[in-house]
């Protein structure tokens, strides 16, 4: 980054007055749902290996669960408190109705994909997921025994009457509502009962091989077994119907950090009640009678637009277990060996000679692990400071930090306790680190620490030298194999000083400090992005070539969107690679006709964030932990770091930006009508996938 380029906030008053038309903005929730359709399209793509298609189906289902737990819950909160609409102008009630309509189609497509496409295709290749009506006599006999021996002893059916009110139903659990006729042992007339399936029960049951006539590997859903034999829980009663259902609840933890003295304790208390918070969705078997559905809605406090009738198991994502249980390499993506860093046994010497760039998963994450392991064992290393947002359960990183602390090094770890759905794991991680003598801090009140930073202080001769790792993704060996992310390892003194100052802010009470190289949320990153967009705008107005290329997971920050519109009007050519939700509407005449938006959905989850600005012939390229979202730019601790080595910057531009702009196999283009369309190779262009090309380069 040029030191002569001051980072000053750009006045947005004129821009804010312009572009007030809600039609210029897409709705975030609907755009996020659109992404799930793109994921589901991978499950329908016959060029994708069959078990991988199954995984894509399950990912679309898991994404939808989280969408309701967080996004729909947020919209319902806005509806309850009368909050103002976003720039798209849609009121919460309108959003919820639109979400219901689009989700109904998505759910229909998901179950059609399973019932009509994937399940038959798997069966044809010897992998059967059997429904109740397809069991033969031997299979049914075995499953009845399994039910009596393994399932029935842990079930506690609850008949509904004045003494047995409707039970509390935990978030996203499998349940059966049973319609009964008859008189029980106490003379009570039965009508309805609820059977809850404990989480200890396997959701997918593999049948013994000897029960298969043709050598197939067969599985059965727990929900099918429960529905088939639930009558055995009610002897003497007649089962008129058994219908599976699942309720989804608001899972956003609410902790008033200004009012609590101990954040960890407050989060532990919140986690206890998270599974029983307000309901936001009811999934129910499609043949369930309407009166029963209304009873469930009443008990969960839901309206009709929260109901989704399904034709299959209520938690379709559970079928992902089949992927791991079926050992058929020919039905999965071929394995690959990522590049490894040469001479990584002497990693400090390598970094001291020059910056090291890694592009995961094509470059092995082991280099990052080697850096930390060698730092822990090196007697010349005096201190290690690191942020942890998400990490693996059996984390080599955590083990290295503990080893370093036990060997007498000063180790400080910023653990983000509020990492969504990893809160409990991170609480346990913090305890484990503290017990080993690591100084653990929880970041800054009111701001999630999402930055990915590692700082190592090493004595070399009479001086101390800082070694730094900065990344766009988490310190997580598992996701590093399936997410695309960038890592920079550097001994650059200015970057090291900036990172040191950031850790002072996070662990102490240091004032806001001016950084030489890095941009930081919530202080300078937002203004820095706006400054660079406006700089390209000024170049374009002077008739100079001006261009912006940016890659991220999502885009919705209003000031950034408006600044991009202004830049487009001035003639700046803008290419945005946005994997998920995007509220910017491209291709609008006289507004955004110079903006192109595409989304890449392929084998690996696109997770890297890269911003490139032409800068009048002296390009600037940044990598970041932040998307161009309001929360990332204004309400989180994030970092954005420049790639100062020209060769590394060119490599990123080629492999991470241009390659994805050339993709015509996994790319979806967003039109001015708000619709994503899958790109197809033109007749004079060869098919090209950026991810495949990068794999073939290994």
From Swiss-Prot:
Pfam families for the chain: PP_kinase, PP_kinase_C, PP_kinase_C_1, PP_kinase_N
UniProt: ATP binding residues: 63, 483, 579, 607
A GO molecular-function descriptor: ATP binding
InterPro entries in alphabetical order: PP_kinase, PP_kinase_C_1, PP_kinase_middle, PP_kinase_middle_dom_sf, PPK_C_dom2, PPK_N_dom, PPK_N_dom_sf
Positions that bind Mg(2+): 390, 420
Catalysis: reaction(s): [phosphate](n) + ATP = [phosphate](n+1) + ADP
GO biological process: polyphosphate biosynthetic process
Root EC class: transferase
Domain of life: Bacteria
Coiled-coil stretches noted in the UniProt entry, renumbered to this chain: none
Record PTM: An intermediate of this reaction is the autophosphorylated ppk in which a phosphate is covalently linked to a histidine residue through a N-P bond.
Keyword list, A-Z: ATP-binding, Kinase, Magnesium, Metal-binding, Nucleotide-binding, Phosphoprotein, Transferase
Entry EC no(s): 2.7.4.1
Catalytic residues identified in the record: 450 (phosphohistidine intermediate)
Any single Gene Ontology cellular-component annotation: polyphosphate kinase complex
Co-factor(s): Mg(2+)
Functional description taken from the UniProt entry: Catalyzes the reversible transfer of the terminal phosphate of ATP to form a long-chain polyphosphate (polyP).
Family recorded in the similarity comment: Belongs to the polyphosphate kinase 1 (PPK1) family.
Protein name according to UniProt: Polyphosphate kinase
Species of the source: Xylella fastidiosa (strain 9a5c)
Lineage summary: Bacteria, Pseudomonadati, Pseudomonadota, Gammaproteobacteria, Lysobacterales
Name of the coding gene: ppk
């Amino acid at each position: 980054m040029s030191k002569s380029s001051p980072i000053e906030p750009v006045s947005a008053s004129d821009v804010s007055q312009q572009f007030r038309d809600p039609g210029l903005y897409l709705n975030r929730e609907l755009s996020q749902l659109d992404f799930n359709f793109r994921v589901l399209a991978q499950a329908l793509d016959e060029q994708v290996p069959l078990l991988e298609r199954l995984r894509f189906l399950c990912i679309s289902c898991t994404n939808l669960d989280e969408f309701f737990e967080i996004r729909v819950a947020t919209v319902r909160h806005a509806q309850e408190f009368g909050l103002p609409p976003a720039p798209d102008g849609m009121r919460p009630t309108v959003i919820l109705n639109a979400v219901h309509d689009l989700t109904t189609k998505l759910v229909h497509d998901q179950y059609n994909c399973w019932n009509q496409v994937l399940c038959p295709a798997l069966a044809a290749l010897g992998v059967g997921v059997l429904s109740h009506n397809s069991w033969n006599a031997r299979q049914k006999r075995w499953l009845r025994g399994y039910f009596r021996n393994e399932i029935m002893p842990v079930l506690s059916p609850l008949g509904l009457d004045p003494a047995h009110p409707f039970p509390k139903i935990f978030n996203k659990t499998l349940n059966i509502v049973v319609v009964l006729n008859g008189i029980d042992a106490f003379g009570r007339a039965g009508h309805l009962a609820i059977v809850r399936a404990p989480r200890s029960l396997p959701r997918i049951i593999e049948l013994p091989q000897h029960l298969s006539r043709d050598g197939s590997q067969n599985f059965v859903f727990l929900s099918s077994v429960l529905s088939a034999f639930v009558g055995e829980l009610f002897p003497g009663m007649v089962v008129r119907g058994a219908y599976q259902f699942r309720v989804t609840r608001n899972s956003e933890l609410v902790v008033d950090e200004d009012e609590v003295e101990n954040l960890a304790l407050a989060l532990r208390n919140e986690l206890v009640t998270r599974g029983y918070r307000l309901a936001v969705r009811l999934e129910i078997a499609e043949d369930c009678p309407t009166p029963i559905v209304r009873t469930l809605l009443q008990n969960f406090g839901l309206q009709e637009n929260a109901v989704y009738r399904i034709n299959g198991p209520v938690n379709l994502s559970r079928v992902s277990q089949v992927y791991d249980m079926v050992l058929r390499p020919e039905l999965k993506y071929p394995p690959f060996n990522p590049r490894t860093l040469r001479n990584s046994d002497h990693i400090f010497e390598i970094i001291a000679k020059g910056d090291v760039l890694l592009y995961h998963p094509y470059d092995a994450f082991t280099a990052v692990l080697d850096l930390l392991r060698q730092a822990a064992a090196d007697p010349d290393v005096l201190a290690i400071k690191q942020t942890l947002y998400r990490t693996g359960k059996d984390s080599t990183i955590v083990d290295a930090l503990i080893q370093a602390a036990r060997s007498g090094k000063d180790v400080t770890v910023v653990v983000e306790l509020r990492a969504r759905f990893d809160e409990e794991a991170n609480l346990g991680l913090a305890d484990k680190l503290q017990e080993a003598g690591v100084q653990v801090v929880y970041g800054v009140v009111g701001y999630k620490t999402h930055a990915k930073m590692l700082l190592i202080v090493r004595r070399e001769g009479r001086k101390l030298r800082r070694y730094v790792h900065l990344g766009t993704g988490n310190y997580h060996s598992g996701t590093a194999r399936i997410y695309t992310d960038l890592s920079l390892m550097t001994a650059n003194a200015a970057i090291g000083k900036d990172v040191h100052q950031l850790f002072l802010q996070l662990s102490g009470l240091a004032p806001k400090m001016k950084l030489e190289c890095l941009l930081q949320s919530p202080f300078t990153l937002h203004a820095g992005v706006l400054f660079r967009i406006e700089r390209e705008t000024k170049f374009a107005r002077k008739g100079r070539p001006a261009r912006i290329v940016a890659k991220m997971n999502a885009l919705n920050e209003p000031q950034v969107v408006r600044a991009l519109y202004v830049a487009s009007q001035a003639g700046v050519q803008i290419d945005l690679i946005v994997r998920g939700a995007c509220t910017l509407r491209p291709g609008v005449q006289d507004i955004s006709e110079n903006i192109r938006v595409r989304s890449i959905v392929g084998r690996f989850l696109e997770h890297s964030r890269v911003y490139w600005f032409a800068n009048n012939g002296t390009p600037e390229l940044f990598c970041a932990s932040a998307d161009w979202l309001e929360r990332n730019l204004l309400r989180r601790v994030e970092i954005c770091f420049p790639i100062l080595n020209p060769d590394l910057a060119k490599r990123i531009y080629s492999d991470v930006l241009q390659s994805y702009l050339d993709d015509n196999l996994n790319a979806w283009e967003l039109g001015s009508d708000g619709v994503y369309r899958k790109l197809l190779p033109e007749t004079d262009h060869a098919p090209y996938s950026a991810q495949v090309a990068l794999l073939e380069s290994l």
